[in-house]
């Protein structure tokens, strides 16, 4: 339970806040029932900080019973907002209510312990403010001392000054407050002098982000004489300055010394002085005597008379100036304390964000860094230009120098940066002189190679390196990957991939040669066309690279760039789409390369690969569902998918396409299959291949036939008046698009109809889906670089992503193993009889029940993947004949009980396949 005191410890929370336990219990909402279901959650807003509860599935009577911990002050106002979460739209506000902690503390005798509040929810609409329901919350764990509210026992006055204006919360100031003499400047600046009078039970004066300008001389209190001095960091100090602004709760113990202090002329007359106030020490401490500069203190009577003449209530500029001249005439020249003036100038500088100035019991000034929870005697300076403060994943503060692209743990200052620059300049000059002396007549081989590089500079973010065996490789800092292929030549249309086992290297002079790792030989001749890098000509060399080699090369890239550990994905089957979207988009793209550990809520299954396969299969079926308007079928007779131009109706459609791109890349990276594939033109666009008119035939036969007719016939004889412009209708809105600049005024003729056909083909593939395609490819490229797919064509990419759909029964039987059964067991014979009699759909359902997916890899059942690599289909004898069959998707194993008849086996298998959903543990 948090207890507040006037000098509460602020080591954990630098702003003096206290912890309050807020339990959001339930709500009763006046709204229509939503047949599609919705999720209700509550936001608690405390001084701009938002804390959310979990989502409740009830739409009218949601219950949470969730405890939230918030940091508050006695003046905090708690705001509760009840929201309705929507999947494809922005969340809707259902109502809001507020609690004033100050009133609640006064009502409940400064104690909030298990206080139950029934809040009326309201919402502003076009007809006014309407009541939308009730919210039940419980406040607990906050006890405030009386001094923290009234701040004094005998005088309830609390003075809060903000921007120079005095605000009195509890009425006019009491007559028992200490009389204070002040000289006001032109801008209402407080240049006060504490008197020797000491008044007990006086109220504190708070200065908030402004100049301390009391409306009358009797509004500032002195600190009690016997109050113990605070310690640094253990309790609140006497004088606090946050970001250069003073918050003086009371003077130090020196206030009881007899005598009238001398006021600094700079503080009294400077019109641009900040709100920082420093208590003036007594005259006996200010006036000193030395050999070079002797200052003789005046008598007490003279000082008092001067103080009366100076500190009259009518403090105009002229009178205050003449008064100070009179005070200075009493002293020799130069008697003003230089230390005092210097400290005044230092305090006018603004502290960096998160820093606070305090004083210890000995009056020494120190500084608190609330960002790192450390203290220092040196005054912090603002960061030099080009520097930035950051926090790493372990909450450690470090500093980034964008000028040199370096980082450091130590906070930089202008002096340290200046010293480092001088040292670095001298070091560079010395190294340059030494290098110029040592290599006077030598040329840099790397510089010569870079100048002679026929491909020019590398793309942005790429770097060329050499390993220990002098093999050149390339680093992509954008995706944190490495590869052997040169990115400048990778994916060129006019250059085909190398044969298996071959590699391109460059000499020191930049001449390209080829390495055959099969025979461990090198040659200047290109094995693809026989042309030499040195001499032109030579015979053509035919070669063929199979799909298996490409797939093995892709798997090698994935394994070499995989990260250790695993990433958990906790989803519910009822909200699979939204849960997966929130978690995948919250992770860093490179974290998605870690091994996946999927958890279905409410199910106790352990993921050794089987749950991940089912998650990919189920989620792909969900996200590619045309019902969400993100994708549509490519044609009437083609059930492959393509991006829906009407997907812009969803305001967050680009975020969803980026998520789908990440998800598809994860499926390729982890070797999992999805349920439904895309159209072949979409795969070609992923591979950056040019789309032709022939690709239109598979997605829009009518459009394709129209363009073919235009190509094969004379359109001028037919009298067709066509222009380089086309209309498109999306959701009933018709828009016109020019195929080229000014196309609506350019007539299509026999001479330019080929250009028209090409532009129409390009427009048909990209109409209304440019932004969606870019978002999809950006999300895909964040996980799997598109360069890794350069060797594949669109059909091979489809097989990699969707697998094989046809089931070869002979291959299935040939690659099945048995445990406690034999090939001639009657249950095994009945099982294969059941598989032969069913259609392909039931076989797919059976395959999904056992392996987690209904798709097969390219190699068929021989390449089924288990938890630790390839694992064949297995049938094991388990249980009694009254049991249902069970499956272990991580190991591709079917537990088949010893049934006594074929009819019993068929009935149990069909029931398990069609009715079972979920995982458990044995």
From Swiss-Prot:
Region of interest (Disordered), residue spans: 210-388
Recorded GO MF terms: ubiquitin protein ligase activity; ubiquitin-protein transferase activity
Catalytic reaction equation(s): S-ubiquitinyl-[E2 ubiquitin-conjugating enzyme]-L-cysteine + [acceptor protein]-L-lysine = [E2 ubiquitin-conjugating enzyme]-L-cysteine + N(6)-ubiquitinyl-[acceptor protein]-L-lysine
Residue ranges, compositional bias (Polar residues): 210-219, 243-278, 286-302, 314-323, 340-351
Domain of life: Eukaryota
Location of this chain's protein in the cell: Cytoplasm; Cell membrane; Nucleus; Cell junction
UniProt effect for mutating residue 675 to A: Reduces ubiquitin transfer
Annotated GO CC locations: anchoring junction; cytoplasm; cytosol; extracellular exosome; nucleus; plasma membrane; ubiquitin ligase complex
InterPro entries xrefs: C2_dom (IPR000008), C2_domain_sf (IPR035892), E3_ub_ligase_SMURF1 (IPR024928), E3_ubiq-protein_ligase (IPR050409), HECT_dom (IPR000569), Hect_E3_ubiquitin_ligase (IPR035983), WW_dom (IPR001202), WW_dom_sf (IPR036020)
Residue intervals of the WW domain: 349-382, 381-414, 456-489, 496-529
Post-translational modification (record): Auto-ubiquitinated and ubiquitinated by RNF11.
EC code: 2.3.2.26
Outcome (variant: residue 855 to A): Abolishes ubiquitin transfer
Purpose of the protein: E3 ubiquitin-protein ligase which accepts ubiquitin from an E2 ubiquitin-conjugating enzyme in the form of a thioester and then directly transfers the ubiquitin to targeted substrates. Ubiquitinates ERBB4 isoforms JM-A CYT-1 and JM-B CYT-1, KLF2, KLF5 and TP63 and promotes their proteasomal degradation. Ubiquitinates RNF11 without targeting it for degradation. Ubiquitinates and promotes degradation of TGFBR1; the ubiquitination is enhanced by SMAD7. Ubiquitinates SMAD6 and SMAD7.
Record text about domains: The WW domains mediate interaction with PPxY motif-containing proteins.
Designated name of the protein: NEDD4-like E3 ubiquitin-protein ligase WWP1
The organism's taxonomic lineage, starting at the top: Eukaryota, Metazoa, Chordata, Craniata, Vertebrata
């Amino acid at each position: 339970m948090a207890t507040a005191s006037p000098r509460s410890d602020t080591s954990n929370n630098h702003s003096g806040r206290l912890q309050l336990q807020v339990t959001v219990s339930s709500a009763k909402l006046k709204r229509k029932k939503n047949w599609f279901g919705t999720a209700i959650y509550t936001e608690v807003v405390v001084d701009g900080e938002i804390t959310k509860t979990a989502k409740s599935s009830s739409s009218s009577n949601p219950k949470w019973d969730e405890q939230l911990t918030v940091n508050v002050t006695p003046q905090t106002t708690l705001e509760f907002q009840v929201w309705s979460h929507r999947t494809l739209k922005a969340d809707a506000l259902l109502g809001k209510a507020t609690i004033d902690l100050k009133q609640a503390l006064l009502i409940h005798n400064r104690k909030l312990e298990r206080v139950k509040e029934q809040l009326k929810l309201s919402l502003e609409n076009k007809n006014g403010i309407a009541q939308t329901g009730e919210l039940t919350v419980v406040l607990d764990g906050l006890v405030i001392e009386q001094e923290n509210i009234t701040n004094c026992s005998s005088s309830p006055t609390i003075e809060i000054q903000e921007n120079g204006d005095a605000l009195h919360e509890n009425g006019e100031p009491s007559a028992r407050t200490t009389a204070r003499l002040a000289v006001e400047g032109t801008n209402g600046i407080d240049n006060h002098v504490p008197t020797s009078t000491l008044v007990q039970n006086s109220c504190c004066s708070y200065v908030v982000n402004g100049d301390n300008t009391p409306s009358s001389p009797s509004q500032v209190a002195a600190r009690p004489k016997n109050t113990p001095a605070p310690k640094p960091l253990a309790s609140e100090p006497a004088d606090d300055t946050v970001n250069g602004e003073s918050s003086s709760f009371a003077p130090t113990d020196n206030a009881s010394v007899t005598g009238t202090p001398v006021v600094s002329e700079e503080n009294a007359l400077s019109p641009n002085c900040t709100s920082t106030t420093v208590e003036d020490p007594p005259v006996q401490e200010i006036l000193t005597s030395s050999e070079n500069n002797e200052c003789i203190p005046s008598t007490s009577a003279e000082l008092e008379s001067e103080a009366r003449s100076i500190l009259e209530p009518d403090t105009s500029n002229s009178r205050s100036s003449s008064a100070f001249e009179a005070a200075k005439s009493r002293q020799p020249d130069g008697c003003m304390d230089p230390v005092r003036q210097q400290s005044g100038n230092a305090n006018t500088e603004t502290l960096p964000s998160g820093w606070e100035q305090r004083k210890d019991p000995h009056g020494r000034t120190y500084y608190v860094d609330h960002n790192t929870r450390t203290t220092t005697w040196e005054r912090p300076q603002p960061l030099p230009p080009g520097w930035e403060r950051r926090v790493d994943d372990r909450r450690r503060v470090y500093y980034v120098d964008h000028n040199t692209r370096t980082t450091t743990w130590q906070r930089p200052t202008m002096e340290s940066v200046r010293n480092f620059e001088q040292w670095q300049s001298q070091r560079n000059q010395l190294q340059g002189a030494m290098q110029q002396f040592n290599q006077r007549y030598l040329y840099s081989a790397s510089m010569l190679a870079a100048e002679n590089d026929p491909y020019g500079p590398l793309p942005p973010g790429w770097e060329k390196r050499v390993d220990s065996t002098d093999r050149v490789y390339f680093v992509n800092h954008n995706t944190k990957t490495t590869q052997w292929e040169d990115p400048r030549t990778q994916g060129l249309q006019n250059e085909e991939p190398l044969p298996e086992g071959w590699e391109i290297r460059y000499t020191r002079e930049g001449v390209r040669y080829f390495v055959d790792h099969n025979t461990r030989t090198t040659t200047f001749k290109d094995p693809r066309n026989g042309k030499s890098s040195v001499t032109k000509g030579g015979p053509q060399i035919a070669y063929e690279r199979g799909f298996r080699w490409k797939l093995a090369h892709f798997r090698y890239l994935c394994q070499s760039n995989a990260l250790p550990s695993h990433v958990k994905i906790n989803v519910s089957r009822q909200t699979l789409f939204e849960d997966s979207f929130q978690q995948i988009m919250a992770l860093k793209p490179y974290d998605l390369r870690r091994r996946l550990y999927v958890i279905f809520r409410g199910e106790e299954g352990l993921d050794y690969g089987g749950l991940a396969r089912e998650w990919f299969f189920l989620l792909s079926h969900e996200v590619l569902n045309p019902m969400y308007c993100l994708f549509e079928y490519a044609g009437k007779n083609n059930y492959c998918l393509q991006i829906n131009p009407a997907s812009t109706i969803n305001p967050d459609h680009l975020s969803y396409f980026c998520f789908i791109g990440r998800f598809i890349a994860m499926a390729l990276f982890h070797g999992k299959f999805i349920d439904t594939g895309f159209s072949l033109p979409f795969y070609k666009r992923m591979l950056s291949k040019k789309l032709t008119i022939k690709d239109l035939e598979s997605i829009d036969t009518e459009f394709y036939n129209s363009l073919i007719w235009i190509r094969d016939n004379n359109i001028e004889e037919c009298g067709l008046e066509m222009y380089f412009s086309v209309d498109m209708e999306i959701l009933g809105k018709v828009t016109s698009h020019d195929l080229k600049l000014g196309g609506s005024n350019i007539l299509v003729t026999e001479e330019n109809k080929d250009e028209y056909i090409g532009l129409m083909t390009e427009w048909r593939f990209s109409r209304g889906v440019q932004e969606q395609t870019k978002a999809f490819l950006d999300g895909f490229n964040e996980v799997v670089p598109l360069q890794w797919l350069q060797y594949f064509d669109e059909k091979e990419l489809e097989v990699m992503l969707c697998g094989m759909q046809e089931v070869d029964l002979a291959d299935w039987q040939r690659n099945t193993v048995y445990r406690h059964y034999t090939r001639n067991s009657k249950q095994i014979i009945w099982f294969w009889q059941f598989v032969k009699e069913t259609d392909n759909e039931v076989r797919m359902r059976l395959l999904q029940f056992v392996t987690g997916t209904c798709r097969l890899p390219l190699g068929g059942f021989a390449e089924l993947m288990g938890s630790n690599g390839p694992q064949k289909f297995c049938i094991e004898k388990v249980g009694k004949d009254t049991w249902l069959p069970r499956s272990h998707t991580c190991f591709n194993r079917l537990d088949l009980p010893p049934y006594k008849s074929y009819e019993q086996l068929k009935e149990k298998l069909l029931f398990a396949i069609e009715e079972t959903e979920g995982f458990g543990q044995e």
